[in-house]
Amino acid sequence: MKLPLLLALVVCSAVSTNLKMVSKRNSVDGCIDWSVDLKTYMALAGEPVRVKCALFYSYIRTNYSMAQSTGLRLMWYRNKGDLEEPIIFSEVRMSKEEDAIWFHSAEEQDSGFYTCVLRNSTYCMKVSMSLTVAENESGLCYNSRIRYLEKSEVTKRKEISCPDMDDFKKSDQEPDVVWYKECKPKMWRSIIIQKGNALLIQEVQEEDGGNYTCELKYEGKLVRRTTELKVTALLTDKPPKPLFPMENQPSVIDVQLGKPLNIPCKAFFGFSGESGPMIYWMKGEKFIEELAGHIREGEIRLLKEHLGEKEVELTLIFDSVVEADLANYTCHVENRNGRKHASVLLRKKDLIYKIELAGGLGAIFLLLILLLVVYKCYNIELMLFYRQRFGGDETTDDNKEYDAYLSYTKVDQDTLDCDNTEEEQFALEILPDVLEKHYGYKLFIPERDLIPSGTYIEDLTRCVEQSRRLIIVLTPDYILRRGWSIFELESRLHNMLVSGEIKVILIECTELKGKVNCQEVESLKHNIKLLSLIKWKGPKSSKLNSKFWKHLVYEMPIKKKEMLSHCHVLDSAEQGLFGELQPIPSIAMTSTSATMVPSQADLPEFHHSDSMQMRHCCRGYQHEMPANTLSVPSLGNHHTYCNLPLTLLNGQLPLNNSLKETEEFSRNNPLLPLTSKELSFTSDIW
């Protein structure tokens, strides 16, 4: 009888001693209420869970057996609002076992607070425990609301234990625990070791963060507990660092009175283990809360975060800046390692400064516009100036004989319309004359320079290959006759155009819209890889200082300009006997021919078609007549020179004796045109 009484006194003494060490949270009707214990019980629906009375583990220095032997009773209640309802244990799904409640198969409706009360006639104390039961989230083996949380610094050692496993441990053996990461089996690397019911990571890396689930079987049911591991940076030993304003470098902000203003304060916080960054503004020795109502702080914004390291921003807001606000403002940042600060000085904006700034920006803007306009209007002139001063010579060592191949249509003068005369005269006379005599380019003109050595197509292809540019003059007659067909039908010429082997200069002498074959011209443009399009606009383009000639020279090969004498204008086939002759305009040639040549009816075998075909093969040249030479009054000092027939050049004479006199007359008369037979190798389109 004395022994139980002595034991009761010891228990009561232990309880009383413990109560002196822990401050009471509440006391109702003489019963000490410790409110809700910090430990939270969590389980998935359908799994077993054990809720222990926290009094025996955190609040008194005794266990359930000793308390029971002294006459103390343990009773369980479930909190429903402000009421505590006694629990009736059914022994089927929920039962009482010593100091705990066993849920053999927990359900979501079991979630709530459970209170254990330990009392006798003299003493009473109680504490509540929280239980949360939830279903698995879709496709997962856990619910994110009932995860345990663990943190570890990167490169440190971390052990993740399986929570509450002691409740399911049998005395004779350790539980067989299986670990998963993100609900999937994983082949752990060598530095991750399973140690009993725990997982040991010897050196934590950033990718080790995630959800770890431990699983075991207990009485035929699965028990799973999930722990979220958050990997952080190493614990910092430095105070935060201000990013703006700069530390030890006060920033000056020019403000306009009456206008709103926002001043951001940005700072970097290393990982310190604290719940949140501490950042605030002050004006002198006063906090912002002590100032006028038109000045306030915004919300702290998280700009960046990585492994617990944060970059945050706090904005100082002025609804309307007044004169009294022109002062120094300081942004303070701190953690448990120290404090840093940075300052901003508000200064009234000077109107003159604003005008100067606007004027300077305006001047720069106008200068840029002026330069843009100058370049837009004179870009070709600028490029030509640069090429003349600093450019090289494109014709050096390229193994090409001609600067350009000139392709145009040879038209009979009598068939020209009055509307097309200017275009055809430009193609036949003005264009080659200016390029060769004024700019010193060497052109290949098939009518003049083609010397047959094989078939016509082969000779033409060879000459195009020897040229650096291909100039196509789109006159009305050229378009009508589809003069470009040869460049599409002959495969070698076509390949040169589409591959960019030769650059093509396309000169439009007329408006293409509405013309016959205009669609084919557009198709030709699309097929040429290197194409430059230049438009000739009639007489105003004929002036040497016009935009047309500058553009044309810009597209021609880069070469050093050479002043040519009149004798150099003639090609090699025209030198020798006629080397000193000077060219005269076609009008003079026509008048000369009309004066000296007998009438067409008087010439034997003279055909009108031959005359039209050969009119462009004759050229007039001017030279000084010797004093002792008898001049023809109707001619003055003009002579007319025609190309020699190929039959004469080759030393061949016709076999037909009946035509001997006529042919002899033709050979001895320099004013007659070549016959169609002698020019059988030529073409109307060059």
From Swiss-Prot:
Cell compartment(s), UniProt: Membrane
One cellular-component annotation, GO: glutamatergic synapse
Domain Ig-like C2-type: 32-132, 141-232, 239-347
Residues linked to a glycan: 63, 120, 136, 211, 328
Membrane topology recorded in Swiss-Prot or TrEMBL: Single-pass type I membrane protein
Positions in the Extracellular compartment: 17-354
Disulfide bonds: 53-116, 162-214, 265-331
Group of enzyme by EC: hydrolase
Positions of transmembrane segments: 355-375
Keywords: Disulfide bond, Glycoprotein, Hydrolase, Immunoglobulin domain, Membrane, NAD, Receptor, Repeat, Signal, Transmembrane, Transmembrane helix
Any one Pfam family match given in the protein's UniProt record, by short name: I-set
Tissue: Detected in fetal brain after day 12.5, in particular in parts of the diencephalon and in the basal plate of the spinal cord. In postnatal brain detected in cerebral cortex, olfactory bulb, in the CA1 region of the hippocampus and in Purkinje cells of the Xth cerebellar lobule.
Listed GO biological process terms: regulation of presynapse assembly
Molecular function, one GO term: NAD+ nucleosidase activity, cyclic ADP-ribose generating
Cytoplasmic side: 376-686
Active-site residue numbers: 488
Family: Belongs to the interleukin-1 receptor family.
PANTHER family per UniProt: INTERLEUKIN-1 RECEPTOR FAMILY MEMBER, X-LINKED INTERLEUKIN-1 RECEPTOR ACCESSORY PROTEIN-LIKE 2
Comment block on domains: The TIR domain mediates NAD(+) hydrolase (NADase) activity. Self-association of TIR domains is required for NADase activity.
The protein, known as: X-linked interleukin-1 receptor accessory protein-like 2
Organism classification: Eukaryota, Metazoa, Chordata, Craniata, Vertebrata
UniProt gene name: Il1rapl2
